[in-house]
Amino acid sequence: MAEEMESSLEASFSSSGAVSGASGFLPPARSRIFKIIVIGDSNVGKTCLTYRFCAGRFPDRTEATIGVDFRERAVEIDGERIKIQLWDTAGQERFRKSMVQHYYRNVHAVVFVYDMTNMASFHSLPSWIEECKQHLLASDIPRILVGNKCDLRSAIQVPTDLAQKFADTHSMPLFETSAKNPNDNDHVEAIFMTLAHKLKSHKPLMLSQPPDNGIILKPEPKPAMTCWC
């Protein structure tokens, strides 16, 4: 399913730019899409981060991601309208095996996420980096490191200097933020828009026609669970 969906995204035109002319409707304007994958352990807040950027708010509730899900947002940069797709997968291996090869296809950037209140999620980062290497992502693909839940100051387990050292070792910028409280440290909006500006300057044209609501794949309804920022 993911393969068919992705093929259709890359092979079609955006429907938002059609205009009428003397001979009827002109071909719709082309728009570029950028696929950014968001990876990390379960419960680090990946879904909440993507929801914050695409919907502009913290979700009232969320469900455990099963398989792959993505959200999309159109933004304008230097007069050009582009689409940012944030792909989010389950952090649990049993939900990832059947989808992972599709998840890494045609990736433009990677966001590694850890929970600042959970040292184990930070220690898992090398395994996520290794997974990227195994799927042959080009070395020039932008990568950033995001520590989430910085608003929970009394529960912080991962100090900034430790995270910064790790980021420097892997040539990644570090951001510390909170999907729940956007006023804490690096704003989620600024993080993804900074990445979008960088991608716009370097990546080739890709054509797309995903639905405007942006949420394409969703798990079957399950009881609500806490997003934990």
From Swiss-Prot:
It comes from the Eukaryota. Gene3D superfamilies: P-loop containing nucleotide triphosphate hydrolases (3.40.50.300). A motif (Switch 2) lies at residues 89-108. SMART domains: RAB (SM00175), RAN (SM00176), RAS (SM00173), RHO (SM00174). Regulated by guanine nucleotide exchange factors (GEFs) which promote the exchange of bound GDP for free GTP. Regulated by GTPase activating proteins (GAPs) such as SGSM2 which increase the GTP hydrolysis activity. Inhibited by GDP dissociation inhibitors (GDIs). Its cofactor is Mg(2+). GO terms for cellular component: Golgi lumen; Golgi membrane; phagophore assembly site membrane. InterPro entries: P-loop_NTPase (IPR027417), Rab33A/B (IPR041822), Small_GTP-bd (IPR005225), Small_GTPase (IPR001806). Its main location: Golgi. This is Ras-related protein Rab-33B. GO terms for biological process: autophagosome assembly; protein localization to phagophore assembly site; protein transport; Rab protein signal transduction; regulation of retrograde vesicle-mediated transport, Golgi to ER. GTP binds at N43, V44, G45, K46, T47, C48, T62, T65, G91, N148, K149, D151, A179, K180.
